[in-house]
Design a protein with these regions (language model features):
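N-terminal active-site beta-alpha-beta segment that forms phosphate/nucleotide-binding
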Residues: 1-53
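Short linear motifs at secondary-structure transitions and domain/linker junctions
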Residues: 10-12, 28-35, 61-67, 85-89
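Short, well-ordered strand-loop elements centered on a beta-strand within folded domains, enriched
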Residues: 15-21, 66-68, 117
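Surface-exposed, charge/polar-rich loops and edge strands
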Residues: 49-54, 62-66, 76-124
């Protein structure tokens, strides 16, 4: 934010979808759903494919870019139509050979840890 980059943060909606809003100042983040800081309603909404990079949270990631998240499927639903590059961040000790996955689970394209960058899927 200090460098003037356009950064969009997620908002979790009651219908279990996610939207993103541009944040220009940390004071625009307010504690909301699940106790997570989200942009306030004054922030401009960002169209889903107006950005090229998505950082995806996860508890653990596997070699194929699948993850265990927090169980609501927000990011899996969003990733199903996202056209940019998705990145998972985790410590190497949280990278497993394989994690359980369901039919709606989506993988990230790249996993980054303190030990390196792993391109696990060809970017879309």
């Amino acid at each position: 934010l200090k460098d003037g980059k356009k950064v969009a943060f997620p908002c979790c909606n009651p219908d279990n979808t996610m939207t993103f809003r541009y944040v220009t100042d940390r004071n625009q983040l307010k504690e909301r759903t699940f106790g997570i800081s989200e942009p306030d309603d004054t922030c401009e909404e960002c169209r889903p494919n107006n950005f090229s990079l998505l950082i995806v949270p996860g508890l653990v990631f596997d070699k194929s870019g699948y993850r265990i998240g927090y169980g609501k499927g927000f990011y899996d639903r969003f990733l199903s139509t996202f056209e940019g590059v998705s990145i998972g961040l985790c410590y190497s000790k949280l990278q497993l050979p394989e994690v359980p996955r369901g039919r709606f689970d989506r993988h990230v394209d790249v996993v980054i840890s303190e030990k390196g960058v792993y391109a696990v899927n060809v970017p879309k």
